[in-house]
Amino acid sequence: DYHWTEVVMRDIPHSMLEGVALHHYSVIDWGKKGPAKEFSEQHYFQTMQRALLMDELISKHSNIMDKYDPGKNVALVVDEWGGWYDVEPGTNPGFLYQQNTMRDAILAGATLNIFHNHSDRVRMANLAQTVNVLQAVILTDEEKMLLTPTYHVMEMYNVHQDAILLPLNLKTNDYVFGNEKLPAVSASASRDTQGLTHISLVNIDSKNAQEVAIELRGGKYTSVTGRILNSEKLQDHN
């Protein structure tokens, strides 16, 4: 609600505001959210449409905040985000227990890239629940537990913590589904306290590999290492 943000930033003394909250879940239809595991490419594409909408939401709320807080003293806090699907069959619908697949890994990586690229205003973002609920990093069953694809994305992205955002220009192919399209690649970059540059790339296209060329400026680089999180199908899970 952009009007809500406008009124809050205009009428409440900023000395009383540490942050303004933004919630956004990647839900296709609140009445029929779709399965967490056995989903179609259409479900995947629509989920990613909703996920990438995060960039527009942050941009528009940030523009309003910039009018009243050009010094960016008040943070935009995205304290609820992630994929939200139908619960696993046989589980309590009130517990929101859902499986976590490679779709969720891609959603998480693309969303974290958006947060990184808006880090001048987004200074906190978190999953509302981390275990057994929605975009969980850990799933448990009695004494058993597993780490989800989302966990592995979070672990890979922790190199960006306490680092400095590096601006980037991204030219990408389109991921086309029917008559609609999304950018095929999502990216963000940072330099850590040791002077190492970290670049995170996400291939959103469910059908095609992406060849990526990276031009680095303003530094001397002597070696490169990389890690890839991948699986055969979007529906794969632990």
Question: Can you name each region flagged by the protein language model?
Answer:
Residues 1-4, 26-32, 82-88, 131-137, ...:
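Flexible loop/turn segments at secondary-structure boundaries
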Residues 24, 73-187, 193-196:
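Aromatic/acidic polysaccharide-binding cleft in carbohydrate-active enzymes
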Residues 7-52, 74-75, 79-84, 97, ...:
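Aromatic- and acid-rich polysaccharide-binding/catalytic face
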